[in-house]
Amino acid sequence: PRIVGETGGKDFVVAHPDCDRQGLLVALLRGAFEYQGQKCSAASRAYVPSSVWDAIRDDLVSEISKIKMGDASDFTNFMTAVIDQRAFDKISGYIDRAKSRDTCKVICGGGYDDSTGWFIEPTIIETSNPTSESMVEEIFGPVLTVYVYDDSDFDQVLTMCDEGSPYALTGSIFSSSEENIQKAYNALRF
């Protein structure tokens, strides 16, 4: 017999200061929140240089505020409920714990409601701790955690990303430089 296993993922996005900022914004938005973040390839942790984060943060939050959530049979909705009560409880628990930590700040979303379905707002957590729970553990929901790093620390961030989670499914590198992409590829390949 043959077995193909799909295992866990804590998929990353690593951005370099020279990246296409609009492309990064779209990738974060769609990568983290399509299918309510309940896909194995969902972008759930991002390492973004401070100059880039300062430039895209408000626009990203604005775009997320426009996401329409509701019934899955209404195809005008971008997001719908998460799969079940267990998932709802797990995801909302991560959000609540992030809200209580000094190193984490929920900058958009963070709300949830299970009165009719299991709805969780698309949520971004900004953290100053690259090993915070929401950066390293698989949440499997509409939660993106962003670690903002000093623009000069790209090499160190590659090491953080590589060592930051036991999962190794997919990841994305954003840079306009082939040299930086190759450097990231070499550091992050499994």
Predicted feature locations:
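ALDH superfamily catalytic-core signature
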Residues: 1-130, 151-163, 179, 187-188
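Short, surface-exposed loop/turn microsegments at beta-strand edges and helix-strand junctions
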Residues: 138-139
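Short, solvent-exposed loop/beta-turn-alpha elements that line the ligand-binding surface or hinge
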Residues: 135
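Active-site donor-binding acidic/aromatic loop of nucleotide-activated sugar
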Residues: 145-147
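Cofactor-binding loop segments of dinucleotide-utilizing enzymes, especially the Rossmann-like FAD-
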Residues: 176
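Short active-site oxyanion
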Residues: 168-171
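Glycine-rich nucleotide-phosphate-binding loops and adjacent flexible coil segments
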Residues: 142
